[in-house]
């Protein structure tokens, strides 16, 4: 197993043992992932959308949904 898969396995196990639901984990992961990419792209929506593999409109909707800042 790769180090990343091992880390994920431990994280998932810990989250399940703490009663964290899939929906909550998914939302938090997506929020953090998008915030990181926005930061790396200096808030450039087009670049961030490309890096995320999603349409700019979808990214804009998710930024609003998660109340993220474009330059976050």
Locations of regions flagged by a protein language model:
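Bacterial C-terminal helix-turn-helix
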Residues: 2-72
